[in-house]
Each structure stands twice: as structure tokens, then as C-alpha cells.
């Protein structure tokens, strides 16, 4: 019988991260701080990881220092993780380029939080993780506390196997601090899935005076371009690795995951594409509406980087004619938010440009996102198909509650 425990999303992520880490370089920032706190507490009380050792917890002077420590620790052959959010993640970006470029299997667990624009907000959205999507880190999204537990495991296993670093993110406060009863994955079961040969290959690449090698060189125009393109195969192979581990975790737990999971009517014509905790709201909405005769669908995005267009389009029912893409971030001046642009591009590349796509923003700074708002998005697909709409402010859709609007 599976062991259950009542925990929050941060603790679920830390439980898995502790198992796979030799070192955790940390600096506290809301709402990610509890991950570092519980890891520090476990280390102080003698808890050991999958390698039979206590995790070395290194608290630095800032998130910039933590990212530098992660990079250096990885170069020394230690599996390393960190926990961060918002402005803290921004301070880590310079080192993230190096970590990805040098194919080091770091995992950053991020309680996704709003960035400080016109004002600071400690609450959740995807502004921080979208601000680092070009670094070369893979990105995997969890939508609930149980998913945080399961997909954190997929993340660490995939990073070690692929040599590609990951950002595993989940919505700040909404998921990071939500307390649920979840099925705990034991370290013994995690160990059965760990590729020990991949761990050895990683450790063998460590800087060592017994077999020195050059790292961090400066390259001229004759070779830099080729080196930059050399990692392409790793990213092309990564979706298969992630799906393979999703399947193995599914066999272990009985909870099945895919890179892109479709739920709803098999012959739906209108669907929403979304990632993070908002997917649960949309799923609740379509379950209610479909029970009354509607034919609506939802596509949950889990692997966001890399974004394999063929797998994404394959997950869409052939009957679909209209898609609304919901982003939990704002990219001022762009033709649309990041997920919207990726969806449009994927449909064009895979010959499904006949599908009409609109995009909208929701939930910035943990703004409320309700089933009535999700219904308004579906109604928009049946109506004027307003594009670049929001769930609040000057381009909003009208919700279907007499006393509650999207303003």
C-alpha cells in the first residue's frame, strides 16, 4: 500500500531534490524558501540521499552566488540543485547559460512568481520562468502537489540521463503552499529508476588534476558556431527521455503522465491550451459543461522546453477547429505571449494551420482564475474570437456571474 503524507508543494519538490543531490546551493526568496529550509533541516538531522550521504547545504550571499556555486559544484562532479523564484531566478540567468552550454545536469526547482515591474508582487505567475526560456534549460511544469512529487522525479532522472539542466516549476503559493495528502515516493523506488551509468559518466567529466582538460575557453569565428550547434541532438532526444521516465514513474505510481495531456470530449472543436495550476480550473469547467452536452477540450502542457511540435500537435484531436492559449505572463510589445507563439508555430510547422488560434493572459500576480472565466474563454471561441484578451484590465472578456466580472 502506498505511503501517504500531508505536505505542500515545496516539501514535495524538496523530498525528491534531496534524494538526487550531493549539494544544494541556496538563498531564500518567497515563495520558494521552504524548499531550502526543509532540505537544511533534513541534512542537519542526518538524512541521507540516494548515494548514502548527507546533502551539503551551502547558503550563499545572494541568488547570484547560489547560481555560481551550483555551476562550480557541477563542474567538480557533484549533482547539484537550487530552489528559487522571481528576482532570484533573474540573478541566476548568467550562470544558467554556462550550465546549459556545458551540459551539466542541474535542476532548479522554481515556485513561479511575478516579477517586479510597476510594483513588486510576491504572488504567483510565470513571468520569472518565461524570462529564462532561452537559456537552454529544459522546462517542466507541475499543476498540483502530487504532480510536483511525481514530475520532480521525472525532472531529476531526465537531467541525469540527458545531461541537460532543467527548471521544474509550479505556481507560487497556489501550488507551492497548497497542502494536500499525496502518495510519497520512497527513495528505494527512486533508486530503481536512477541510471547509475549516467551518474558515473557525469562524475567522470568532473575537473580533476589527475586528468586535466580545458573548459571555458574563448573561441574564434572558425569554430564557435559549430560548437554552439553541437548540442542539437541532445535536445532532439530529450522529449523521448522525458516521456520514457514519465512512463516509468506511471508504472511505479499508477499515475500516467504525457508531455501533453488531452482531456475532454474526444470530438471537441474548441479547446484551451494551458499549463500550471490553471489547468485544474479548466478541467473542472469542461467536466461540468460536457456533462450538459458541450463538446470542449483541454490540452495540458507539461514539457515546455524543448517544445516538440510533432508531439504537441499529435495530442490535439483531429476534430479541433479553434484553440485558445492561456499564458500566465505578459510580454509587452510582442505579437503574443510565449506559449501562444509556440502553439501557433507548432501548428504551422505540422500542417495544422487551418486551426484558428487566439491567445490571452490570466492570473498575473495570483489574480483569481475561476470556472466562469474559463467558460468565458470558450464562449469567446464561439463568438467574436477576440485575440490577445486578458482575464482583467482593458481587453477583458466578460464572465458569466451576475456579481463577478473579470475586472
Residue ranges and their predicted role:
Residues 2-7, 23-30, 34-41, 54, ...:
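Metallocofactor- and cofactor-centric catalytic cores in central/energy metabolism, strongly enriched
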Residues 23-59, 273-299:
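Anionic-ligand anchoring segments at beta-strand to alpha-helix junctions in alpha/beta enzyme folds, i.e.
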Residues 35-40, 69-72, 92-96, 117-123, ...:
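Short acidic, glycine/serine/threonine-rich loops at helix termini
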Residues 37-131, 137-160, 247-392:
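Thiamine diphosphate
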Residues 51-55, 166-261:
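Conformationally flexible catalytic loops at phosphate/diphosphate-handling active centers
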Residues 395-402:
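Conserved small/polar residues in nucleotide/adenosyl-binding loops
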